[in-house]
Regions:
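A short glycine-rich, Lys/Arg-flanked "PGG" loop and its adjoining helix->strand segment in the class I
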Residues: 125-137
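Conserved class I S-adenosyl-L-methionine
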Residues: 1-45, 142-165
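Class I SAM-dependent methyltransferase SAM/SAH-binding core
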Residues: 51, 57-100
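A C-terminal cap/extension of S-adenosyl-L-methionine-dependent methyltransferases
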Residues: 156, 160, 190-248
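A short SAM/SAH-binding and catalytic strip from SAM-dependent methyltransferases
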Residues: 110-123
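Short alpha-helix
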Residues: 170-186, 190
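A short acidic, Gly/Pro-enriched loop at the edge of an enzyme's catalytic core
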Residues: 99-111
Length: 248
């Protein structure tokens, strides 16, 4: 079974609980501050043709639309795309794989992925190849993913093997290897290592089995704490990396 199909079946089993935890207002506040703002820094999104790849219900689409982008959501799950189209009628959902999207070459200004690439092992590089194909020259690939070679990843790897919330093929991305492979085709504009207290307990409340009713009470202080710690984080102590690449 291919990596995307494994993830689709896994997600379908946990979809209701997943959306409750990752789609609530507290998690969206986290995304906007620590994913979306650094991912799209310096990019005028107004009027751009954008793909949210592996879109789910469109958590990043919400931000992109607010900035004036025209968004297509791409996901392998037909049920997910139905939900996406219902939630974002001004956008278009396409049921297709990011490994072979069927979309026209050189046709999009930006592709955004939040937490999707690490679900694709061992096919991450194949996804980047497809993204490169559909991006216009000068187009952006913006992504946020758990990364290897960090202390949090050591814990994550131990946890993934023992927690049924994670599929067997989930693995943090090897950013150094990705950059070596694609150095001739992308300019690496931005790279920021982030993720500490609020990432763990606000965004990932489902992983820690935290009751949803508690999140509104502890979210504000943890967001503030994460903002204080973030400027001092590097690769070794961060939970994820935010990258902005540009097609040559």
């Amino acid at each position: 079974m291919d990596s995307e199909r494994i993830q689709q079946l896994h997600y379908d089993r946990i979809a209701i609980e997943y959306e409750a935890h990752y789609g609530d207002a507290c998690s969206q506040r986290y995304r906007d501050r620590f994913f979306h703002q650094p991912m799209f820094k310096g990019v005028d999104l107004s009027g751009l043709e954008v793909i949210e790849a592996m879109c789910g219900s469109g958590h990043t689409t919400q931000y992109l639309i607010s900035q004036g982008a025209r968004v297509i959501g791409l996901d392998i799950s037909d049920e997910t795309i139905k939900s996406f189209n219902k939630r974002w009628p001004e956008s278009q959902g396409v049921c297709a794989s990011i490994l072979d999207s069927g979309l026209d070459s050189d046709s999009f200004d930006l592709v955004a992925i939040v937490g999707g690439l690490h679900h694709l092992h061992p096919n991450v590089n194949d996804a980047i190849e497809e993204i490169y194909r559909i991006l216009k020259p000068g187009g952006y690939l913006c992504f946020a993913e758990p990364h290897k070679d960090s202390f949090p990843d050591l814990i994550r790897r131990w946890w993934y093997k023992r927690d049924p919330l994670f599929a067997d093929n989930e693995e943090a991305i090897d950013l150094s290897e990705m950059k070596r492979r694609f150095a001739s085709r992308f300019i690496f504009n931005r790279e920021r290592y982030l993720g500490n207290a609020a990432y763990l307990l606000v965004l990932n409340s489902m992983v820690f089995r935290i009751p949803l009713k508690l999140k509104p009470f502890y979210t504000p202080p943890l967001l503030h704490l994460e903002s204080i710690i973030s400027p001092f984080q590097g690769r070794l102590l961060s939970c994820f990396v935010v990258c902005q690449w540009r097609k040559k």
